[in-house]
Structure formats: structure tokens, C-alpha cells
Amino acid sequence: MKSIYISIIMKSIYKICIDGELNELKKRRNEIYEIIEDIPNDGDDLREDEDDISFAAAYCKDHDTALEMYKYLYEKCGYPRHCVHYAMVGAAASRNAKLINYIYNDVDEHEKEEFIGDLEDELAMTDHPNPRVFIEYALFELNKV
């Protein structure tokens, strides 16, 4: 019974994230905590990328709002760190260089090479015309600004 309830609130929050409704997301903090409790542990998490609300937050078309929603989920609500991959996939799909840069600068040093490889794969799957140029811009050029 609880999984049906979690599924319903997850779909609702997912839509809020896609639509970029940051203030509405903040009002739903208790429900976010319930979703977090229901997320499988790292290694047991076999969900699809699109099944995570951090994907939806990162996929938001307003890139500045996407960054703020990401920060809210991970820094304020304590969203599980093993779900960062889902956010990276959403950011790659929406071509959000600012969020990709933020995520990259926040991952552990030993995870950066794997992150770049995964990012390149995701960009290729979304038919990005030149993943390498985008990655160089997102990860290195934005740091110079």
C-alpha cells in the first residue's frame, strides 16, 4: 500500500520539478523525505534514469531553476548521493552546462573520470552533435567565468 502512495507523490513531485516550480517543491519537503526513505540503497538501485525526481529537477528547461532544485534536493533535503547519476542524465538531456559543471565540481576527485565518461555516453545517446566540445565547455570553460 505504501508503494502506491509513494508512487503517486513521486509522480506529482516529478511534474513539479519538470515544470520548474521551486517554491511548490519546497512546500512538499515532508513528501520528499518519504520518497527518500523509499529509494533503494546504492548497489540495489535498479531504477531507470527517468524514474528519479533528481532527473526531473535537472531536466527542467529553465537551467537556473534546475540548478536551484538540484541544490535543494541534495543539500537541503539530503537526497541520496548515489542518485547524482540520474541528475547528470537529466542535465545532459536538457543540455544544462551550468548544472553539469556544478555536479562535476561536487563529485569526489576519484569519480571525475567516470563522470566524464558517463556524461559523454549520455550526450551521445541524446544525439548531441559534439559531446566533447560541450563537455569541455561545461566542465572547464564555465570555471573560468
PLM features: residue spans?
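Ankyrin repeat (ANK) tandem alpha-helical domains that serve as protein-protein interaction scaffolds
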Residues: M1-V145
